[in-house]
Amino acid sequence: MKYSVKQTALEQENKSLFIAIFENQELSPAALKLDLKLKGEITEAVKNGEVSGKIGRILVLRHGAQRIILVGCGKQNEVTERQYKQIIQKAVKTAKETIATTIINALTEVKIKDRDLYWNVRFAVETIEEDNYIFEQFKSKKSENNSKLAEIIFYTEENHEQAELAIRHATAISSGVKAAKDIANCPPNICNPAYLAEQANQLAGRSSLIETTVIGEKEMRKLGMNAYLAVSCGSKNEAKLSVMEYRNHENPNAKPIVLAGKGLTFDAGGISLKPAADMDEMKYDMCGAASVYGVMNAIAELQLPLNVIGVMAGCENLPDGNAYRPGDILTTMSGLTVEVLNTDAEGRLVLCDTLTYVERFEPELVIDVATLTGACVVALGQHNSGLVSTDDNLAQDLERAAKLANDKAWRLPLSEEYQEQLKSKFADLANLGGRWGGAITAGAFLSNFTKNYPWAHLDIAGTAWLQGQNKGATGRPVSLLVQFLLNQVK
């Protein structure tokens, strides 16, 4: 889909239009102008009840090849973000069922609570791109697309530059979300740690601002990344740590922001085997790495003036004669020892060594992203990612970004008491904290490996993919993280 911004006299346009109608028979400014040209046709349709301001109500007026799509938008100044998404989805779905090839979108006049024109335009583009996403690379028969709609022009009388910036940001973010979804939806017989490394190398080939280094198991052994390697022991696919260095800060020596993603390309649980039901979805245990990859795609497109290092910690967790066992004690790269109580609590073992590894970059801050715990899904459901942090300022910055991006996150506590649940009789730490507060104790475990930099952890176990009829990766939290990075640009 092509997007642009235009300041135009709607009443003189012959292109198809989205026009807002509000409750209480209130016409938007654009509708009033157009109604004069149409000699009261819109007013008449509202009075007759053919269309109302109720959200989701649609009426299509036909004038030659032009389609004027009247869209019910609720109460002006009281429209919520969720309602606005429904409005955009309904309007675009209707347009695709017409002969329209280009739409001038005057729904920019809809006032969303606590949002501005920039957000209105950006969220519309992101919503449209999300709904356009289809993953059928492995289907022999592709879906037919009979829609002629190819371009949406955002109508605005002012703040033209703000709207154009919104389109630029939204298209880059949507591109990043798509990239994340594509590799997350890829089957595990294809998407393994080597595949993640290949994607990282290809990204470096496409962007002169990115340099990729891939670390294999031989080098990991030299570095003492024994916790990471233990998880990989049951798989024939070698673990790969893919490091994507994006450097575009005016000061090349400026400390980088590090994003580290858990990349379990398949997690059967190891010796602590998962139940068979829904195990196919454990291909999504690499969505943390996928989201980091998506973010790196987006910032390369935006050419943000920052130094950012994206790390994909690729690995598989499978049962095998060589697999690590409950009861094993592992010496991590940091020197801390960990008693394995459950081999299905593997993500924290991969991440703890990754978090130690990234110290070499002397980071300004580190954010890890992981489908880490089912406990987080129980606590927060599928709407909010879990946020844990040892740094209040960083946590607040992420919460602010989550709100701006409408990619929700909720901060969980991280007080010292939770460390008590991680005590082991035989090692420095246990890799499991017991039944209660599992999302928090997982974060508490990781915090032991982040003493040398500000750190935050996003648990996306509930938000990274959907089940049921809409099964598939969501691309979250790419929007949140790109927004966070946009906010870091001075």
Curated annotation (Swiss-Prot):
Residue positions annotated to bind Mn(2+) 2 are: K262, D267, D285, E346
On cofactor binding, the record's note says: Binds 2 manganese ions per subunit.
Give me the Gene Ontology terms describing cellular component.
Answer: cytoplasm
Query: What's its catalytic activity?
Result: Release of an N-terminal amino acid, Xaa-|-Yaa-, in which Xaa is preferably Leu, but may be other amino acids including Pro although not Arg or Lys, and Yaa may be Pro. Amino acid amides and methyl esters are also readily hydrolyzed, but rates on arylamides are exceedingly low; Release of an N-terminal amino acid, preferentially leucine, but not glutamic or aspartic acids
Sorted alphabetically, the Gene Ontology BP terms of this entry are: proteolysis
- State whether keyword Magnesium applies: no
State its Enzyme Commission number(s): 3.4.11.1, 3.4.11.10
Zinc as a keyword? no
> Main site of residence?
cytoplasm
The Gene Ontology terms for molecular function here are: manganese ion binding; metalloaminopeptidase activity
Q: Which CDD domains match?
A: Peptidase_M17 (cd00433)
Please state what class of enzyme this protein is.
hydrolase
Gene3D superfamilies, A to Z? Leucine Aminopeptidase, subunit E, domain 1, Zn peptidases
Task: Name the UniProt key words of this record, in alphabetical order.
Answer: Aminopeptidase, Cytoplasm, Hydrolase, Manganese, Metal-binding, Protease
Q: Which InterPro entries would you find in this protein's record?
A: Leucine_aapep/pepB (IPR011356), Macro_dom-like (IPR043472), Peptidase_M17_C (IPR000819), Peptidase_M17_leu_NH2_pept (IPR023042), Peptidase_M17_N (IPR008283)
Q: Which residues form the active site?
A: K274, R348
Residues binding Mn(2+) 1: D267, D344, E346
Cofactor dependence is on: Mn(2+)
Q: Where in the cell is it found?
A: Cytoplasm
- Annotated family: Belongs to the peptidase M17 family.
Function noted in UniProt: Presumably involved in the processing and regular turnover of intracellular proteins. Catalyzes the removal of unsubstituted N-terminal amino acids from various peptides.
Q: Could you tell me what this protein is called?
A: Probable cytosol aminopeptidase
Q: Which organism is it from?
A: Mannheimia succiniciproducens (strain KCTC 0769BP / MBEL55E)
The gene coding this protein: pepA
